UniProtKB/Swiss-Prot annotation:
Organism of this sequence: Gorilla gorilla gorilla
Gene for this chain: OR1G1
Primary location recorded for the protein, binned into one broad class: membrane
Protein name, per record: Olfactory receptor 1G1
Entry GO MF terms: G protein-coupled receptor activity; odorant binding; olfactory receptor activity
GO BP, sorted A to Z: G protein-coupled receptor signaling pathway; sensory perception of smell
Amino acid sequence: MEGKNLTSISEFFLLGFSEQLEEQKALFGSFLFMYLVTVAGNLLIILVIITDTQLHTPMYFFLANLSLADACFVSTTVPKMLANIQIQSQAISYSGCLLQLYFFMLFVMLEAFLLAVMAYDRYVAICHPLHYILIMSPGLCVFLVSASWIMNALHSLLHTLLMNSLSFCANHEIPHFFCDIDPLLSLSCTDPFTNELVIFITGGLTGLVCVLCLIISYTNIFSTILKIPSAQGKRKAFSTCGSHLSVVSLFFGTSFCVYFIPPSTRSAQKDTVASVMYTVVTPMLNPFIYSLRNQEIKSSLRKLIWVREIHSP
């Protein structure tokens, strides 16, 4: 292996989905449509929350941050893929690949953290409604969101620096449409034990904390809802967390298929297709889930559209 320390390589090649020109044209159109819908939908949710003072509550503060994370998340991977299809190239620079890895890990973990924080918010709202305003103070909300951003920025930086310390062999082809950590580790010609150990410890710990927060919060939520005597009261209580539960199921369900399925039953093609679900489809569906199942969001959207019609010439 001497003389083959290739950490200074200039680029990787993202194999993506297909090399057939006709299939690439179809993929370009599909992903461009999904990307535009995702960014527009999430930015619209943020705009609605900012402009409607009635939505200036902890729940919608967290939702605005989740929408921002979704818009950034999809912007980390899809634009580069679209650009490569457009210029008929599979190349991504070494620094560009590490930069993509950094932001991908930042936003995927940030999404998990924010969903856990939102579950805690719903727990307090349903299980301790009389103390909700006192517990979910503006200071605590800002702290929870700021801590999520900072912790995940540092967590992503750690993994990116460790990846940069590896040497890569002659094969620079990544069987994926973006620079994910597992495909990159498989290309290393040096022992990635340290990287894998850090992934196991930090990734396992942060993932466990998020999942436990979700499980504990929703266990208490469902327990409280079942104790409500009237059916109308149960429906009203469940409606406050139904949208969030749908998003949680979609995000964690699809990401589970990529990272927790035994390697013996996985393939690069299956992982790539499954990755589309939580990197592209989930961020695209989130605004629709919240707008269709949330009466306050729908009402604010109607008011925003009505105001624009009134002021339009």
